[in-house]
């Protein structure tokens, strides 16, 4: 499939005049752009593959090459279609719109207004920061051929699964994408190794959390995942750590991994387990997606369904703000008890309300859940705050989650993050309330995910940041994206980086750490903040498995050696 010429032409010609976003290195510190070999080849360069090259490559991958036609193309130029454009705009906030595309991403900032459906019709449709082409991967051979072609032609390679990444790691100007989304195999089987004996599932790299949960449930099984059904499991989620409703019960997503089946940058097909290629296993399991290899499938533990209680609580900020935040404090006070009882909670403080849910209690009765919440409800009654509380006991996590995990409308949240240990949180209750109140007052959303990782949870050594393991809460501080107001979006981005994240960091020793999947892409000192004590070893392994930097993404291990120039070309930093 090849794009209409206007899309390709504008994609190249107009790229340079698009609004730019900051990169970790200034243009001055980069080696010269143009077609310099220190930069990846870019559309318009002499080195860019000819139409005949693309045609031959397309044939070599069985016609699975997709030339990008941005979703917003129906809103511009000669392909404008009023009805379809209205449909695209209406669908834009829903994850499926982007996950089912070979190029679109959920974080609009990294689309850089390329062929933006919300821009006026007369604005040219440019491919811009979307990948130029993507291979709809169906086999290991597709991956190997794409890796070979991209390296032969010095192209920027982008591994993309669902496009959920908050850092824009699954898109890239002038990129050739490996689109993993349609690898949907799902094989439940018995597994035996030194580390684990029991049920397991081997899933293709395109399996999403909701698909996994539904299929496993029918077989009486539960698979660890996050709260969002559209996030992919084998990509950034598990490779980056993987928090979710079952974290306290079974450990992180990464802790479930028994085997990776992957392709290295040099094209070698490889299996990595705790005992075979164990250093690659270690790096892939927590060191961040899109860094060491292209994962074709992974094998993870499967747990038997068990009784699970779900709960939620909401109350508005309707009267005195002081009173509202006393209510929030009452909820904060029970967070350690939820973890101690084996549960997790997700909540968001907005300027107008507190919304708690899902609270998940695996192997917990409704009576236990209600007793944990009783002091909060009593306090809310005493404060005369009207609330809505609900809890329910189910025979499986799947059913509990279906009842208590609210639908996620996810497109376009800009975020920062901080991990908070129990002693820091319980030792300074007023400090956290004041910081959160200050953020909410300025229009920020403060989402918390609480959990507890006991040392009794067995897992092979992996590269998850130890700070993630030691924390009680992962805070995500967000500001909703406004599709029609880029200037305000940039202002909000500055608020996150310069005000919101520092407000939480100020409460933590040495400024604290953050979960590498849910944090600010402009985080200063991200190597330490995201990877902690593992960074040095992870960088050594990057040099072993990907010495030429074939895999690059903002804030991935070794990414500081490359940066984007003003025109978004990816170049080595001198
Ligand atoms: C709405 C929403 C809800 C979320 N909820 C949670 C949550 O509950 N818990 C949690 O821990 N995180 C959560 N996240 C964060 C999520 O885990 C990350 O965004 C993660 O990177 C998504 O992975 P993906 O593969 O689906 O996305 P993509 O954007 O496609 O990829 C993310 C990264 O993984 C790489 N990658 C993808 N596939 C492969 C592959 N096969 N091989 C090698 N590299 C690959 C990409 O190159 C990229 O670097 C959420 C994010 C969003 C937007």
UniProtKB/Swiss-Prot annotation:
Pathway: Secondary metabolite biosynthesis. One of its GO terms (molecular function) is FAD binding. PROSITE patterns: FAD_PCMH (PS51387). Disruption phenotype: Leads to the accumulation of dihydrosorbicillinol as well as to higher amounts of oxosorbicillinol. Glycans are attached at residues 58, 112, 136, 266, 312, 363, 384. It holds the Pfam family FAD_binding_4. Keywords: FAD, Flavoprotein, Glycoprotein, Oxidoreductase, Signal. It comes from the Eukaryota. It is an enzyme of class 1 (oxidoreductase). Its cofactor is FAD. Residues 1-27 form the signal peptide. Disulfide bonds: none annotated. Its EC number is 1.-.-.-. Residues 126-305 form the FAD-binding PCMH-type domain. Belongs to the oxygen-dependent FAD-linked oxidoreductase family. FAD-linked oxidoreductase; part of the SOR gene cluster that mediates the biosynthesis of sorbicillinoids, a diverse group of yellow secondary metabolites that restrict growth of competing pathogenic fungi but not of bacteria. Sorbicillinoids biosynthesis requires the action of two PKSs. The SOR cluster is required for the production of trichodimerol and dihydrotrichotetronin, with sor2 being sufficient for production of trichodimerol, but not dihydrotrichotetronin in the light. This is FAD-linked oxidoreductase sor8. It comes from Hypocrea jecorina (strain QM6a) (Trichoderma reesei). The lineage of its organism: Eukaryota, Fungi, Dikarya, Ascomycota, Pezizomycotina.
